[in-house]
Amino acid sequence: MIQFILTILSTISLICGRLIFNQRHRLLSSQNRIIHSNEVTIIIPARNEERRLPHLLQSLQGQQGIYEVIVMDDGSKDNTKEIAQTFGATVYEIEQNLDRQWFGKSHACYQGATNAQSELLMFVDADVTFGHPHAIEKILNTYRKQHNHGLLSVQPFHEPDKFYGSLSAIFNLMTVVGVNQFSSLARQSNNDIAFGPVTLMHRDDYFKTDGHKNAQHSIIEGFALGEKFESVQLPVTVYEGGNDVKFRMYEAGIQSLIQGWTKHFSVGADKTQPQIMLAIVMWLMGSITSTLTLLISVFTKPASRIVSFLFYVLYTSQFVRLHLRVGAFSMVLLILHPVLFIFFIFIFANSWRHTHFSKKVEWKGRSFKIN
């Protein structure tokens, strides 16, 4: 009886897995390229980024459409400034607010925008790299679809360089499917959620909406920007990074990974539409139900063992396929998905504790309040 119930739950899980990520949003292909003048300023907020910044700046070399590259140095104690200047970027020091109540990435981005000279503003995290010489051009071409207005954002493809980085697998997938634009289950409505690592806006729209000022009390600036743009009827679009835009998250160690995802999920989960969240939960539960079904089948008839093994293989193949859309994760961990599921639950519980009890999270030596 238990095995039968687990089999039914595993079946439901497989169906949910088919529905949570059955719509794709990719940047325009190279065959649709349009030659661009130098119309975009790249703005990079940076705090102690001497290790990651060279990869980003190197990937910007030879890109089409860039007017200038600005690095906003947010009190770095390392060689961030010197490295940026070596690559020809213009570096500005962050001017601290008198009340010191606004700081961090959103503060750096807004000050960067005030220094920019071009019509288009692209905000790029320091851990991002562009996968080929036409990546910026593809983003600009895609933005033309919305007539160079509104907010376009890209979630980079995750390429962890260390084994522990693959522990981020489920979180990366949830970041994409949780914005309600990649599932046929989503209610038809305007999108008010944006990804944070790469965002593109016209400067008129940016200052009309007050840009990153909207995020001065937000942990995830993409949410605040998306809500503001949508509230004034400006389009908000989201895209997968694929081979065009990539990043390596939390290279400083597993502790930074834990802190980073705790910060992200402390406010992110409530943005997902209920029906999509239910489907996500049911799909993730398939990691446990398919595994338990397989383990219990050891003590049952051969036919049951075959069916249980088949369900585990089907779920695992689906699990692997969905995750490889958003990152190059360890195949070992993807196949041993219960390990990833347990780690996900640990972070989610830790995030819930911060959200409802401590009301703050730590990131890069700073404490951020959760509203």
Annotate the PLM regions.
Residues 39-41, 68:
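Cell-envelope/extracellular polymer assembly enzymes that use nucleotide-activated donors
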